[in-house]
């Protein structure tokens, strides 16, 4: 019996003890548990990845909707600004035309007043000159009759 034999016997005993203690089953159970844990972690990672993809898709959709809404708001604001500008332009043009018409009316009234004033003064001067001429050349009775007739004529023409 040499040392190799005893080494073989010790090995067989050791393997027997391992089998008796169910070490291969524990190793298999430990490996199975580890494999199950890895499988669960992979499943969890897959689930988290799908959830992240769904969230990403949802956020991208919301971003597109927000961009579209912002674009619509900008377009609406531009249309509103154009309407306000055109409305202000129309109102300004109307205001200017009203002010121009009012100024033209005032000018026309001033012209009429000036013409009437000139006519009135011309009539007054003509009447005074005619009265003076008549007073110098005509006697009192004829002058008085002529003066009355002239005054009557002027009154009818002015009215």
From Swiss-Prot:
Its main location: membrane. One of its GO terms (molecular function) is proton-transporting ATPase activity, rotational mechanism. Pfam families: ATP-synt_B. It comes from Chelativorans sp. (strain BNC1). The gene is atpF2. InterPro entries: ATP_synth_b/b'su_bac/chlpt, ATP_synthase_B_chain. It is found in: Cell inner membrane. It is a single-pass membrane protein. It comes from the Bacteria. GO terms for cellular component: plasma membrane; proton-transporting ATP synthase complex. F(1)F(0) ATP synthase produces ATP from ADP in the presence of a proton or sodium gradient. F-type ATPases consist of two structural domains, F(1) containing the extramembraneous catalytic core and F(0) containing the membrane proton channel, linked together by a central stalk and a peripheral stalk. During catalysis, ATP synthesis in the catalytic domain of F(1) is coupled via a rotary mechanism of the central stalk subunits to proton translocation. Component of the F(0) channel, it forms part of the peripheral stalk, linking F(1) to F(0). The chain crosses the membrane at residues 1-21. The keyword Transport applies. This is ATP synthase subunit b 2. Belongs to the ATPase B chain family. The keyword Transmembrane applies. Keywords: ATP synthesis, Cell inner membrane, Cell membrane, CF(0), Hydrogen ion transport, Ion transport, Membrane, Transmembrane, Transmembrane helix, Transport. F-type ATPases have 2 components, F(1) - the catalytic core - and F(0) - the membrane proton channel. F(1) has five subunits: alpha(3), beta(3), gamma(1), delta(1), epsilon(1). F(0) has three main subunits: a(1), b(2) and c(10-14). The alpha and beta chains form an alternating ring which encloses part of the gamma chain. F(1) is attached to F(0) by a central stalk formed by the gamma and epsilon chains, while a peripheral stalk is formed by the delta and b chains.
